[in-house]
Amino acid sequence: MRIFVTGAAGFIGSEIVRQLLEAGHEVVGLVRSEENAAKLRAAGGTPYIGTLEDLDTLKKGVAQCDGVIHTAFVHDFSIYQEACKLDARVIEAIGEVLRGTERPLITTSVTAVLSSNGKLGTEISEVPQPPIPRQLGEVTTLKFASQGVRASILRLPPTVHGAGDHAFVPMLINVAKNKGVSAYIGNGMNCWPAVHRTDAANLFVLALEKETAGSIYHAVAEEGIPIKEIAGMIGKRLDIPVISVSSEEATEHFGFLSSFLSVDNPTSSILTQQRLGWKPTHSTLMTDLASDAYF
């Protein structure tokens, strides 16, 4: 198949591109710059210059292809709600092109749309009300599943790890370096699920090839890692004290990260593994943190 990939130059998207090409697919990748276009060409893909905001150009690219994997997202947490609204508009535009074609569309969401109260979330768990902003993209995706699009959702955990990661864990490491301590909130027993980037990319490819319209998949290799353990490994690697901060102190210490660090989001992928035959095999988060990939 000829697959249109948004975020093709990203941390996860670039690995998806590699695996799609390895599986014999053609890739047309949405990229913003000539620099990223050159990288995509070198990998064997075809660059398509555009942005998420330019929906007309995006739709023309989608129309050339047999399916879509949408991973791009504006990761600017100062405008998070607007980024989620843009994500929904992008999915709407893609869905309009694919409507009635029975072509596959895999969109990206997050496990945090599920409850953050420590209850194990599954692929069939109900989303709590009111939903978080990221749920907008899920609602839009599922709408097209009943309109002749093989649309499904792949939820990523807060920690998609591996060499080149620049998300929450590297941010925590930078906070620890700047503060001289590695901290967690309260007793630190709230959990984040995790997955290695290579395993996550593999799930996108499997979902593209095997998915059923309206499905939700979880790219989760580890159901829940206590934040205290993550902070402990960071402290060990940086040779700095590991401390607890109160919820009142958390915002001053972590900034915007405090709201994410307070989430208790254990998540299962048992149904995903059963339905798609997905088996995560790569290193765990703590193994990666013990290596030189992050330090």
Curated annotation (Swiss-Prot):
GO function term, MF aspect, one: aldehyde dehydrogenase (NAD+) activity
Superkingdom: Eukaryota
Gene Ontology cellular-component terms listed: cytoplasm
InterPro entries referenced in this protein's UniProt entry, alphabetically: Epimerase_deHydtase, NAD(P)-bd_dom_sf, NAD(P)-dependent_oxidoreduct
Stored Gene3D superfamilies: NAD(P)-binding Rossmann-like Domain (3.40.50.720)
GO biological process: cellular detoxification
Database matches in SUPFAM superfamilies: NAD(P)-binding Rossmann-fold domains (SSF51735)
A Pfam family hit: Epimerase
Cystine bridges: none
Xref: PANTHER family: PROTEIN YEEZ (PTHR48079), PUTATIVE-RELATED (PTHR48079:SF9)
Family: Belongs to the NAD(P)-dependent epimerase/dehydratase family.
Protein name: Uncharacterized protein C2A9.02
Native organism: Schizosaccharomyces pombe (strain 972 / ATCC 24843) (Fission yeast)
